Each structure stands twice: as C-alpha cells, then as structure tokens.
A protein has these predicted regions:
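Intrinsically disordered, low-complexity terminal regulatory regions
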Residues: 1-68, 151
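Short loop/turn motifs at secondary-structure junctions and domain boundaries
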Residues: 48, 108-113
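Short hydrophobic/aromatic beta-strand element in the GNAT-like acyltransferase core
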Residues: 53, 118, 130
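Regulatory sensory and allosteric helical modules in signal-transduction proteins
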Residues: 59, 63-109
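A short, aliphatic-rich beta-strand micro-motif
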Residues: 115-122
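Sensory-domain boundary capping and coupling elements
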Residues: 122-135, 156
Length: 158
C-alpha cells in the first residue's frame, strides 16, 4: 500500500488527474473495506486539488447519509431528489453546478461553497451513494472533472 502521495500542483487539471489515478489505484489495491477506501479517495482528492469539501454520502433507508469526507462539518442526511446530491441520486447522473446559489433547492451546508459536482457511486448496477465535491470558487468544475472523477469512483466498484 502506498503511504504517501506524490502531489504536483503544476500541469493542467487533466495532467494532475492522470498523475493521481495510479496512486489511488495503489491505495485501493488489496483493501476490501469500503469505508477505508472511500476515506482514502477523499484524502487523495483533497490533498491533490485542495477543494473546499470532498466526500461521500451513502444510501441508507431511502436517504443519503454522510460518509467519509475531508473538509468542514457537513449535512448528515439528504433526502432523495433534494439538493444537488439527492438530485444526482434520483436522476442517476453527474451534476455540475457552476453557481450553487442558482441551483433550485440547493442545500447550503456551508456558505463558503460556491460551485459543486456530484457523481453517483455504483456497486454493480445499483447506486450506493454519491461523491460530492465543493469549491469556494464559482464555475470551478467542468467536463474534465466529470470524466476523471468518474474513472476514480469506478475504481471503487472493481
């Protein structure tokens, strides 16, 4: 298991993802505990990109419950179809929000959050949670994030 990440803040966003993905693969290799793997993915993403908040919400009894995360304290439960996370879960799709204040029904867990990306987390064909990433900058996330974060969370279903 890798104990340290080689973090480079130089290069394009895509180059940073390409450098990080094999390191995440090494972190996950041989580890079967879901919580440990989710926690390490959060830590690796936070360390590489220094986002305001990165974490998982896991499906439990028809709502999303806070899982491993990096960042300030967060909302603990989100109903299906509510906010960005609940909407991503209900629609079974990635949602990129350039300005969270413009998203109908946004759940403001932290006022410093300005933009967000949420991706469904699958186990086989079933959604078991979502990856939620927040930035304190407007329009921080784009299709590059969607592509590479999808690749990263697919590693969790391997």
């Amino acid at each position: 298991m890798a104990e340290d990440l080689t973090i480079s803040k130089t290069g394009t966003k895509e180059e940073q993802y390409l450098s990080l993905i094999p390191q995440i693969e090494a972190l996950l290799y041989g580890e079967t505990d879901q919580i440990a793997n989710l926690a390490n993915v959060c830590a690796a993403l936070k360390e590489q990109f220094n986002w305001f908040w990165v974490g998982f919400y896991l499906v439990k009894d028809q709502e999303l419950v806070l899982g491993p995360f990096q960042g300030p304290v967060a909302c603990t439960r989100i109903k299906k179809g509510k906010g960005v996370c609940g909407t991503s879960w209900a629609q079974e799709e990635t949602i990129i929000v350039p300005d969270v204040d413009a998203f109908p029904g946004h759940i403001a867990c932290a006022s410093a959050s300005k933009s967000e990306i949420v991706l469904p987390l699958y186990r086989g064909k079933n959604i078991i949670g979502v990856l939620d990433v927040d930035s304190e900058y407007l329009s921080h996330f784009n299709e590059i994030d969607s592509i590479y974060l999808t690749k990263i969370i697919k590693l969790l279903d391997a």
